[in-house]
Amino acid sequence: MRGRLQSQSALKPRARSFFLFVALPAWLGPGLLDWWCHRRTHIEEPANGGTTESLVHSAMFAEAGLPLLLAAAFEMNPFLITLMTGAAASHEVTAMLDVRLALKSRRHVSQWEQHIHSFLEVMPFWIVPLMVLLNEPVTNQWSLTLRPSALSKRDLAVVAGGVTIAGVLPYAEELVRCLRQARRAHASSILSSAEPTNVSSLNRESA
């Protein structure tokens, strides 16, 4: 029994190291590669998915990161685990919507991007158990209770910096790029529709 308790107490540091040096890069790295694939195939063009698909990508990023933020801010209990699992399930549903949008668009989705999507789809389902291990012990309360973070301030800075640099900024850039292109396309369509009217007016004046 004593050896078992010692093994359980040693699990938490191992889970922390696995989260920081394996799980976090495994989530942010493919996410950044996915953004690069979108940029390379000009997702900002309306026919290539445009703003709608970019918003779906932002939603997926938030759904994947929500379990991490919840586990860092609140005590681990059945209610929190339910919320984290719900976020993971929501991520899967949004991923299915992303696939439907990609199939309808004209953008070429390479085999590399497809493999990246497959990897990202399963990420929340093994991140959630990892965060449960990282934030032991699990209480029996069914409420959200703030707790001291299981990670140090330095760890939190690494997580926040990584999420910002490899997640928030790239996908914000993608969304802004899509919105700008949508405005350009809208302005161009207005000008195109106005041109025939101007031509017909000139013809009547000439007559």
Q: Can you name each region flagged by the protein language model?
A:
Residues 28-37, 88-102, 162-178:
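Transmembrane alpha-helical segments that form the membrane-embedded catalytic/substrate-channel core
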Residues 2-21, 66-82, 130-157:
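Helix-coil boundary and interhelical linker segments in multi-pass alpha-helical membrane proteins
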Residues 45-58, 109-116:
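Juxtamembrane helix-capping/reentrant segments at transmembrane boundaries
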Residues 151-207:
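A hydrophobic membrane-anchoring alpha-helix module
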Residues 78-148:
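Membrane-proximal helix-loop-helix units in multi-pass membrane proteins
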Residues 32-52, 182:
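Membrane-interface helix-loop junction between the first two transmembrane segments
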Residues 57-71, 119-129:
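Core segments of transmembrane alpha-helices
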Residues 37-40, 63-76, 94-105:
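Membrane-helix exit/interface motif
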